[in-house]
Amino acid sequence: MRRSRRQGERRGRWAESLCVWWLRLHGWRILARRFRSGRGTGAGEVDIIARRGRLVAFIEVKARAEAARALEAITPRQRIRITRGAEAFLGRFPLPEKGQARFDVMVIAPWAWPRHLKDAWRLGL
């Protein structure tokens, strides 16, 4: 693994950990981190799956030098793969009665608090 890739991986894990703490401080319960539905299924990894009350959020974390660039980094193809991962999670762990699911994005930029963009997109589910 190249050095720049390792640094990116380390930065991504740090950003996810920061988001987990931010979510916990705001009343969320973390159900899973880096959830994968399995190799060869076409489903991507969901960075964080969190629950507050009857709401389950599938959260993609992006760390970039500028917040706007972080949002651009989530492509339509990536959204579809994350949605498939969410469907696989819900297949194993169904929503609570009258529960809801949504897709959120958390953006990490230098010298700023994490930004939690709620209901960032809708697909399937």
Curated annotation (Swiss-Prot):
Pfam family of the protein (one): UPF0102
Organism: Rhodospirillum rubrum (strain ATCC 11170 / ATH 1.1.1 / DSM 467 / LMG 4362 / NCIMB 8255 / S1)
Family matches, as InterPro entries: Restrct_endonuc-II-like (IPR011335), tRNA_endonuc-like_dom_sf (IPR011856), UPF0102_YraN-like (IPR003509)
Record's protein name: UPF0102 protein Rru_A3692
Similarity field: Belongs to the UPF0102 family.
Domain of life from the UniProt record: Bacteria
Family annotation (NCBIfam families): PRK12497.1-5
Gene Ontology terms for molecular function: nucleic acid binding
